[in-house]
């Protein structure tokens, strides 16, 4: 278990805050449960009653398209009542604290909070202060974590590669500002991936990133050699407080994934991206739309994975 406990006294998942320290049994249970939900999308009636009568509040303090939409779809397919709050026009803009906002919503008999916030630790703070009947899902907090994105990435890898124990995985791009990268590394390690590489210029890597058990490369030619899975990341300009790169054109020249660079990886390698993509910056359109790209299926799997997380938290 991590330093931010996510489990109740019975060892069951109470909140999903981070992939760090998440037991492998629970991680696999989420992936297996998600597998059972993939068929729901293909039905004429795309609903099952596992969360009927439950209220799910989406609290997004940062802009989001894929994450907020897939959480909403997932909750509705489980028959939950979904309340989407525009935090940009909420009482927070009038000076109300985060915990006061949550306490007021809890008084409205919320069952689950899905929280995205620009401050690291926001979801953990909420989880520590809500009652035991309420569950909190971290939908991304600052630079810290984005556990459901990492879980849907693991689901995607398992769908296409089956066995984690034989894989060589490369995460390429802005590792420094990426909560996704941190969550991916923890999940990949827990699932037994023997070699995780990070490829980025020195200015886009966290200090002492090697302590996470990854191999560091500053060169795509060496870093992509014989890789099975390529996980691309965008440049997070909104989190950059100073100049980390000379230009996006130069970044694309050295770190953008082109058809030529993709040839360095294994011939059956898959290309992933959590979105939003910046074509011509971290990835060439020919690769993004090519036969080795699994970027669109990756988005679709997010619904089943988020259904699984909410269902398990609700005790199903």
Curated annotation (Swiss-Prot):
Keywords: Pyrimidine biosynthesis, Transferase. L-aspartate binds at residues 94, 179, 234. One of its GO terms (cellular component) is cytosol. One of its GO terms (molecular function) is aspartate carbamoyltransferase activity. Its EC number is 2.1.3.2. It catalyses: carbamoyl phosphate + L-aspartate = N-carbamoyl-L-aspartate + phosphate + H(+). GO terms for biological process: 'de novo' pyrimidine nucleobase biosynthetic process; 'de novo' UMP biosynthetic process; amino acid metabolic process. The keyword Transferase applies. Carbamoyl phosphate binds at residues 66-67, 116, 146, 149, 275-276. Pathway: Pyrimidine metabolism; UMP biosynthesis via de novo pathway; (S)-dihydroorotate from bicarbonate: step 2/3. The keyword Secreted does not apply. InterPro entries: Asp/Orn_carbamoyltranf_P-bd, Asp/Orn_carbamoylTrfase, Asp/Orn_carbamoylTrfase_sf, Asp_carbamoyltransf, Asp_carbamoyltransf_Asp/Orn-bd. Pfam families: OTCace (PF00185), OTCace_N (PF02729). Catalyzes the condensation of carbamoyl phosphate and aspartate to form carbamoyl aspartate and inorganic phosphate, the committed step in the de novo pyrimidine nucleotide biosynthesis pathway. Belongs to the aspartate/ornithine carbamoyltransferase superfamily. ATCase family. Heterododecamer (2C3:3R2) of six catalytic PyrB chains organized as two trimers (C3), and six regulatory PyrI chains organized as three dimers (R2). This is Aspartate carbamoyltransferase catalytic subunit. It comes from Nitrosomonas eutropha (strain DSM 101675 / C91 / Nm57). The lineage of its organism: Bacteria, Pseudomonadati, Pseudomonadota, Betaproteobacteria, Nitrosomonadales.
